[in-house]
Design a protein with these regions (language model features):
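A boundary/linker detector
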Residues: 1-39, 125-138
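Generic serine detector
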Residues: 3, 8-10, 24, 49, ...
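Generic hydrophobic, helix-prone segments enriched in Leu/Val/Ile
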Residues: 4, 9-17, 48-52, 56, ...
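Short cysteine-rich loop/turn motifs with clustered Cys
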Residues: 16-67, 98
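Residue-identity detector for glutamine
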Residues: 18-19, 31, 41, 86, ...
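Short Cys/His-centered divalent metal-binding micro-motifs
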Residues: 64-114
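Active-site or metal-binding loop neighborhoods of secreted/extracellular toxin and effector enzymes
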Residues: 102-138
Length: 138
């Protein structure tokens, strides 16, 4: 599935999953899990595009070109299904922007999985990426 089809809906959903974000930050003690820095982004272990693809296929959601093409009831329905599906997966992890960019440069921007994350976390912890990020993280 072409991930660009989901851009409008993805932006809407990302702006409306505050509880998941709060829970993810709390789970990471409000800091990057690698550096302890308080400046971080939240990485979805099971990507937003994966969840959107799942709910589009399983619930026969019609993808519209613009978020304004959905009714409030449709958006509420989609968001509730998304939150339900998202709860099946691990919370997000808090990581520095530079580390987040590194992950996606290695594994792509869309359709990421927990398995990719666990491999990245292992490699990061083992120093595999030290040379790449040496000058990017203070």
């Amino acid at each position: 599935m072409d991930s660009t089809k989901y851009e409008s809906l993805s932006k809407y959903i990302r702006g409306n999953i505050q509880q998941w974000k709060k829970d993810s930050m709390k789970n990471c003690n409000y800091q990057c899990i690698f550096t302890g820095n308080k400046d971080f982004q939240i990485h979805h272990l099971y990507g937003v595009s994966n969840i959107l693809n799942d709910i589009v296929n399983n619930y026969h959601i019609v993808i519209k070109n613009n978020i304004n093409d959905y009714s409030k009831d449709e958006l509420h329905y989609i968001l509730n299904i998304f939150i339900k599906e998202q709860s099946k997966y691990p919370l997000g992890v808090c990581i520095r922007k530079e580390i987040h960019v590194l992950f996606h440069s290695l594994y792509g921007q869309y359709y990421n999985t927990p398995e990719q994350w666990y491999q990245f976390q292992k490699d990061y912890t083992n120093g595999i990426y030290d040379d790449i990020i040496k000058n990017k993280i203070a």
